[in-house]
Amino acid sequence: MVSAQLHFLCLLTLYLTCGYGEEGKFSGPLKPMTFSIFEGQEPSQVIFQFKTNPPAVTFELTGETDGIFKIEKDGLLYHTRALDRETRAVHHLQLAALDSHGAIVDGPVPITIEVKDINDNRPTFLQSKYEGSVRQNSRPGKPFMYVNATDLDDPATPNGQLFYQIVIQLPQINDVMYFQIDSKTGAISLTPEGSQELDPVKNPSYNLVVSVKDMGGQSENSFSDTTYVDISIRENIWKAPEPVEIRENSTDPHPIKITQVQWNDPGAQYSLVNKEKLSPFPFSIDQEGNIYVTQALDREEKNSHVFFATAKDENGKPLAYPLEIYVKVIDINDNPPTCLSPVTVFEVQENEPLGNSIGIFEAHDMDEANNINSILKYKLVDQTPKVPSDGLFLIGEYEGKVQLSKQSLKKQDSPQYNLSIEVSDVDFKTLCYIQVNVIDINDQIPIFETSNYGSKTLSEDTAIGSTILIIQATDADEPFTGSSKILYKIVQGDTEGRLEVVTDPTTNAGYVKIKKPLDFETQPVSSIVFQAENPEPLVKGIEYNASSFASFELIVTDVNEVPVFPQRIFQANVSEDAAVGSRVGNVTARDPEGLTVSYSLKGNMRGWLKIDSVTGEIFSAAPLDRETESVYRVQVVATEVGGSSLSSTADFHLVLTDVNDNPPRLAKDYTGLFFCHPLSAPGSLIFEVTDDDQQSLRRPKFTFALGREGLQSDWEVSKINGTHARLSTRHTRFEEQVYNIPIRINDGGQPPMEGTVFLPVTFCQCVEGSCFRPAGRQDGIPTVGMAVGILLTTFLVIGIILAVVFIRMRKDKVENPQSPENKPLRS
C-alpha cells in the first residue's frame, strides 16, 4: 500500500511540475485513446490526464467502468481497484467534457482499457483421474485418449500456454516408455515400443502420472498440476488370418469369399494393397472385412499371392499396421508332360556290352513338383530302324535311363536309331524323341604333342582367372564324338586346387588358368602333371599310357605381404572388478614371409589395456568400469619386425560384465517436494530410485526403509513396485520448515548394495496450490524509514510548488484588476 501511495504522489508531482498547459506522455487533449494496463496492479494508479478548454469544467466517465475507473474534475483518469483480466479483458468507456451546468461540450470519445495478462492462475486438470483403454498393437502416435487442463490466463501469452508430460509410468519394464503424450494437446498414444510389446495377458493395465505446466513448461516459476491416468490394455482382434488355400482353375461362380479381417471397432473402412502390382488384381474386400477371390487362379502362372488388408478411419488415416494375407494356389493336373528339346541325342560305341547305360532321358511337367500330378512315367513305343532287330533299347519306367537290351550295335547295320518315348502323368500323354548315334569304338588314346611344357615363373599375386599355359593333345578316333573329345585334369602337384584346365570343344586345346590365389609361402615350386582322357570309355584292352600325360613346373615368386590375422574381430569377456594386470585376452597374427610380428594397441583412449608386444597377450592396465563403457574397443596393430615393417590391424572388443558396485540413488532431483501448511489431512509423495549397475531382464527389486530411528512416528515409507515408493505423513502436526527425510534403499543384488538418500520435504504456506516463500530484504528496495522520508520530502516539494502558484496568482490579480476573476458578481 505504501509503494502504491508513493507511486501516486510521484505522478502527481510530475503533473504539477510539468504544468497543465503542456501536453506530454501523461496528459493530453480529449480524444479517443487506448491504454494497456497489467492486471493485479495496486489501486489508485493514474492512467492519464485529459485536458480541455472552457467552458468545460469537469468530465463524465461512462461505460464498462465496473466501479473501478474514476476521473477527477481536473481530468485525472485512474483505477480504484486492481484489474482482473479473467473478469474482463477489455473495458470500453466513454468520456465527455461538461460545462458548469452539466451539459456536454466535448465528446463523448471512446476510451479503451486493455487489461494485460500476468501469470496469476495455475493450470488445473478437468478431472483428478482419467480412465482409458487401448488395443494392443495399435498404431503408434495415434491418440486413444486425451487429458485436458484449463488455465484462466491469456492463451495468447506464455502465461496460458500449457505443457503436458508423463511423469511416471507404472509398470515401466526395462526403462521403456510404452506411452507418450502430445505436450500441447494432451493426446496420449502408444510409442513404437508400446505398439510392439503391450500384451493384456502379461500386464492388463498401466498407471500414468501426468503433469501440466503453464509458461509452455519453459520457466522454473511456472505453475503446475498433476492427474492420474488408468489405462487398460485390450486384446487386438486386428490380426492376420491363417494362410488361405485355393484350388487353381476353379469353375465355381466368382467372386468367392476366402477369408475375413475385422477391425476392433465398427466403422472402419477396409481396402486391399496389391503388393506385387498384379494386373488385374484378382482379390477384393467389402466393408464387412470379407475378402474375395474374383477370378480363377492359375498355379503355373503364380503359385502364391501375398497382399495386405488395411483399415482406415473416416478421414482416410490408417488405424493400425496393414495385415499380410497369404494365399496358396493348390495344384490340379492341368498340364501335360513336355519334352525338354525336340530331339535328345545320345552316343553309343560299337560293340558296347549288353546293359550298358546310354544316357538319362528327362521330360518336364509344369504341375507342382513332388506331387502326383507331376510324376512322369516313360515308355519306349517305337524304334526306327528295326535292324538288326526291334527292341534293341529299353528305358527305365520312372528314372528314364536308356540301355542296350539285346546286343551290341554295329555302325554298318545303322549309324543312327530314332526312338519314340511316351511320357505320361495321371491324365496326359506326350511323345518325345531320342536319337542314338552309333560311333566308332574308342580304341585310340589322346596323345600330348609334348610330354614336358617346361617351367614358368609367376608372382604370387597373379590375378585369378589368368591363363598361364596352353596344352594340346590329339585323338585319332571319330571327330566330334565322345571318343575323340579330350578332357584334361591335373593329377599331381596341385593338391590345393589352385589351377584348372578348360578344354576348347573345337580344337581340344587345354587352357590352364589360375583358380585360387598362388602362395609362395606354402608352395613356391609345383611340379604339375596333366592327364588327357576321353569322356567315352576305352575299349577293352586299350589303356591310357605315358603319351596321355605331360609335365609342367610352376615357380611362384614372393611378394611382401602384411601380417595376417586369423579373424577380423577378437572378443573377450571379463568382470569389471578384474585386478589391474589381469590377462583379459590374446590375439595372434602370422607374417606370410615368416618374419617376427610385433604387437601394439591403437585407440586405447582410456588406457585400460596393455599388450605384450611379443606374444599378443592383452592385460588390464587400469581399473575397469562397466558403467563408464560396457564394451571397450581397441585396435591391435601387427607389424613386421625387419623387412618393410608392413602392418595390419584387427579389432579387439572387451565386454565388461557387471558387478553390483553402485548403491541406489534417487532417479532425479526432488528439491521441489512440498506440503501446504497446515496439513488438513495426512499426505503422501511418490519418488523413484535407480542405480548405475546393469539391470537384468527382470525388473529391479529395490526395498525401502526409513533411514533413522524415531522417524516412524511421523513418517512412513511404502514400496509401490521395484523402482517407486511412497513417502507418507502419519499425522498433520508438522511445523512450517524443511524436513530432510533419510530413506535407506537396498538393491537386492549379489552382493547387495545399500545407500541412504535424503528427500527434502518443505511444509509451507500455499498460494493457489503452490508454495509461497516471502522474499527477504533486497538491495535497492526502500525500507519503511526510507519510505517515510521520501513521503515527507514529496509533501515539502508540493508545498513549495503550491506556494509559488498562489504567489503568482496573487501577483496576476494585482497587475490585472479588471480580469474576469476580479470583477464583482452582478446582482
Curated annotation (Swiss-Prot):
What gene is behind this protein? Cdh17
Q: Where in the cell is it found?
A: Cell membrane
Q: Where is the Cadherin domain?
A: 29-127, 128-243, 244-339, 340-448, 449-565, 566-666, 667-776
Record protein name field = Cadherin-17
Which Gene Ontology molecular-function terms are recorded?
Answer: calcium ion binding; integrin binding; proton-dependent oligopeptide secondary active transmembrane transporter activity
| SUPFAM superfamilies noted in UniProt | Cadherin-like
Query: Which PROSITE patterns does this chain map to?
Result: CADHERIN_1, CADHERIN_2
Q: Tell me the residue ranges located in the Extracellular compartment per UniProt.
A: 26-786
> On the Cytoplasmic side, which residues?
808-827
GO CC, sorted alphabetically, is: basolateral plasma membrane; cell junction; cell surface; nucleoplasm; plasma membrane
Superkingdom of origin = Eukaryota
Q: Which organism is it from?
A: Mus musculus (Mouse)
Tissue specificity remark: Highest expression is found in intestine with lower expression in spleen, bone marrow, lung and testis. No expression detected in liver, kidney, heart, brain or skeletal muscle. Expressed in precursor B-cells and myeloid cells.
Q: How does it sit in the membrane?
A: Single-pass type I membrane protein
